[in-house]
């Protein structure tokens, strides 16, 4: 994993909570709709930017630049990818609280996967350290001969058994949900102590359980909703919202612009018809991209990233850190993606992702990939209201109100 002369590893999770989780805004039984508000936690963990890039590239099976691979896979005194900070320098993280059986865990809602996997009591004790744990032996029913595995080319991953158990998100319970209980995780997963697993909102046929694929949590509640949709209204430096079964028109401006979804690979994938960097429009550049709430960065074609960073004085592709960087005191230009006639504008401040510790250099929230499809992650989503509609399927986009 990563290493640097100017930080000390800090593995202990020292978070505290500052916002309670919102319960459903209405009774699902009578309205077919409900809302989840992300939970804000303050933690003394600070992610190293190249490590976060490594996570996104690895998840989407993209080639790793040598520097990113070296930083992410080096196992040494700084192997956990965190830096020590003082109490006044804590980070804020936004997570989603879920109850499985009698256990409460923090998970990522992830449109880029269809697996519902969590840290469990079946892991070795060292892998459970600083995580909230699911205890399937207390409330779950094991699915015989059903297993799962997530693996990447660099040797990282997770694997385990499958149990049926009740799973409740924002008070809405699925009484018999397939939960993928980890029996093994690589140390890179174990070191991510802010969350305890993933609840995938991709398509059911992308689920990784074998020999019989299992329904996602959303797949199990979809028929109980007013409409087969969920929306994401994620925020920059604030808790965001997921709405289920309806479109909250108070959260967006204007009419959403829709694109058809190609779900053949299980992703929320579509084709965009252009982009803008600063005042430069490129309305004929079409590219495919996956919309992924579980990835921090937006991983875009090299032609787009090079054009964007060419507008920023002092920007460079930093080979030591494996990505595009720039002076932290720089005011970044806007970036936009064209969706039919709608330009989805990303403010420059959303692209200034993080300062590299010990320097005056910041790491960009837009980074390059050479292979299609691209990935639109948090740096894009935190300015947009996005509709994920299983009727079609299709996605709608509008500016946040």
UniProtKB/Swiss-Prot annotation:
Secretion signal, residue range per the UniProt entry? 1-22
Show the InterPro entries listed in the entry: Aspartic_peptidase_A1, Aspartic_peptidase_AS, Aspergillopepsin-like_cat_dom, PEPTIDASE_A1, Peptidase_aspartic_dom_sf
Q: Tell me the compartments it is located in.
A: Secreted
Q: Which UniProt keywords apply?
A: Aspartyl protease, Glycoprotein, Hydrolase, Protease, Secreted, Signal, Virulence
Carbohydrate-modified residues are 80, 102, 282, 329
Name the EC number(s).
3.4.23.-
**Protein name, please?**
Probable aspartic-type endopeptidase TRV_05382
Entry function: Probable aspartic-type endopeptidase which contributes to virulence.
Which family, according to the similarity comment?
Answer: Belongs to the peptidase A1 family.
Gene3D superfamilies reported for this sequence: Acid Proteases
Name a GO CC annotation attached to this entry: extracellular region
Q: Domain Peptidase A1, which positions?
A: 94-398
Gene Ontology biological process terms in this record: proteolysis
Alphabetically, the GO molecular function entries are: aspartic-type endopeptidase activity
Active-site residues, as the UniProt record annotates them: 110, 292
